[in-house]
Regions:
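Beta1/beta-strand and adjacent pyrophosphate-binding region of the FAD-binding site
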Residues: 2-14, 189-199
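Short, well-ordered coil/turn residues at beta-beta hairpins
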Residues: 12, 159-160, 180, 196, ...
Length: 513
């Protein structure tokens, strides 16, 4: 019997994969999507969406803890942790079914098997196998069984995402040494939790567990929380988290994790001037669990036959995409997202930072539209993505929303404040809506270029920051100036007024501060 043949096969059913599959189907290709777990990928099932459900619960707990200040009395506040976790799992399940429906609607064949590419183009061969997948564990270990069938295609898009990194001396064990999946699915809340890494994952889970009564310690090797953000944001966030009762250890390295006893013992030491932990000052921290949130690498192990010679770079699949550097300004350019193998493309987390779901989805669309245009199936060449106009969001409280360059990145490029750029900052404590809603932590910071006033970067710390950043993302995409932000009437009273005031501040004419 002849193998099934498709025009396009997408491997990976996350926000990059399923969006790319839909766009290919819209353009007239015969499409299949291979996902060995559940449709929606990590984002929908184990990341972005269920974590926001947990954060919504934590926000409610935070409000209830402040009930006296709101003039409300409810009596003793109790919670059922299993139901809290269960609600987040229900949210994920509902959306998972929604993505499966989208595949049927767009006549995309969903193949729920493990894929291995054994032959590159022009006629790509993909072996399909059953597998035993422990989806609830980090890093989702899998046992692959014998080949069930083989399919062929003209093009394949790899959208397999990323896998969490561990430490040489601390491997995920599904019990005491956690990744995000264990933190999201654990029905026995720990009394003490140590989090290694102060990026989005560490900050968000820290916020959740702290508001449900867990004693949380966050360890970060650099000098501030959310270290990829603007330095001013990170330092202010560090102060705020300390104020709210988190145990914060910045400029601290982890030397060892001992999980042999009842709980975990984490040996740490302050970072020395040589960039290494000073072992003469080490101390041991104890907790019930430790969550490793130290970054990710591309997930492609076992996906390609070794004989194909797939090129990789720094733990990711190599394409014509090159991640941004703080020291190198970037101009948007057309990308094909092609690998070194004929007919094989790759998008999303598997090709490198910034490891964001919305970037993966956009890359998938651009990848498909680019080859479709070359084949006469799309009416125009797609507008390339500007990787300096990507909003980044962290959903702890206060939230962080950012787009464009940080001030430290501009300094690394040799730009000088007052000569090449200027900065405007407006604190939420001076904003009527923030005072009325008890959300006075944080600020809006706008960096404008000189002499024209174009938006180089915007960094928001505070309530609704992840929503407010959309305005400034569009402003940067359209090459708007602070003068145009100022000339745009912002409704009163809103948190958006802080954006308007920060634009005014960047020109030295702030009104309400």
């Amino acid at each position: 019997m002849a193998n099934k043949h498709f025009d396009v096969v997408v491997v990976g059913g996350g926000p990059g994969g399923y969006v790319g599959a839909i766009r290919a189907a819209q353009l007239g290709y015969k499409v299949a999507i291979i996902e060995r777990a559940k449709m929606g990928g990590v984002c929908l099932n184990w990341g972005c969406i269920p974590s926001k459900a947990l954060i919504a619960n934590a926000e409610l707990m935070e409000k209830l803890a402040e009930q006296e200040e709101w003039g409300i009395t409810t009596g003793e506040v109790k919670f059922n942790w299993k139901k809290v976790i269960g609600r987040s799992r229900d949210v994920a399940a509902k959306l998972n079914k929604g993505v499966e429906y989208l595949m049927k609607k767009n006549k995309i064949e969903f193949i729920n098997l493990h894929a291995k590419i054994v032959k590159a183009g022009p006629k790509i061969e993909i072996e399909l196998r059953d597998c035993d997948l422990q989806e609830e564990l980090t890093p989702s270990p899998v046992k692959v069984n014998k080949v069930k069938e083989t399919i062929t295609c003209g093009k394949v898009i790899i959208a397999t995402g990323a896998v969490a990194r561990d430490l040489p001396f601390a491997k995920f064990d599904g019990d005491k040494i956690w990744g995000a999946r264990e933190a999201m699915n654990n029905t026995d809340r720990p009394e003490k939790l140590i989090i290694v890494g102060a990026g989005a994952i560490g900050m968000e889970f820290g916020y959740v567990y702290k508001n449900f009564g867990t004693e949380v310690t966050i360890i970060e090797m650099l000098d501030r929380l959310v270290p990829v953000e603007d330095e001013q944001v990170g330092k202010e966030m560090t102060k705020i988290y300390k104020k709210h009762g988190f145990n914060i250890k910045v400029k601290t390295g982890v030397l060892d994790v001992d999980s042999s006893g009842k709980g975990v013992k984490v040996t740490v030491a302050p970072m020395g001037k040589d960039g290494k932990p000073d072992t003469s000052k080490k101390e041991v921290l104890e907790a019930d669990k430790v969550l490793l949130a130290i970054g990710v690498g591309g997930r492609y192990d076992g996906l390609f036959d070794d004989s194909l010679g797939l090129e990789t770079v720094r733990g990711h699949i190599k394409t014509d995409y090159v991640p941004l550097s703080d020291t190198t300004p970037s101009e948007p350019k057309p990308l094909d997202y092609k690998t070194n193998l004929p007919g094989v493309y790759a998008i999303g987390d598997v090709i490198g930072p910034p490891w964001l779901a919305h970037v993966a989805a956009e890359e998938a669309v651009l990848c498909v539209e680019r080859f479709a245009f070359k084949e006469g199936k799309a009416k125009h060449d797609p507008i390339p993505m500007d990787y300096t106009v990507i909003p980044g969001c962290t959903y702890c409280h206060p939230q962080v929303g950012s787009v464009g360059y940080t001030e430290q990145a501009l300094k690394a490029q040799g730009l000088k404040k007052g000569e090449d750029y200027d900065v405007g900052v407006f604190n939420n404590g001076a904003l009527g809506k923030a005072i009325a809603t008890r959300h006075t932590d944080g600020f809006v910071k706008i960096i404008r270029g000189l002499p024209r006033g174009e938006i180089l970067g915007t960094h928001i710390l505070g309530d609704q920051a992840t929503e407010l950043i959309a305005e400034m993302t569009l402003a940067r995409r359209l090459e708007a100036t602070t003068e145009e932000i100022i000339a745009t009437v912002h409704a009163h009273p809103t948190m958006h007024e802080a954006v308007h005031e920060a634009a005014l501040a960047s020109e030295g004419r702030v009104i309400n501060s």
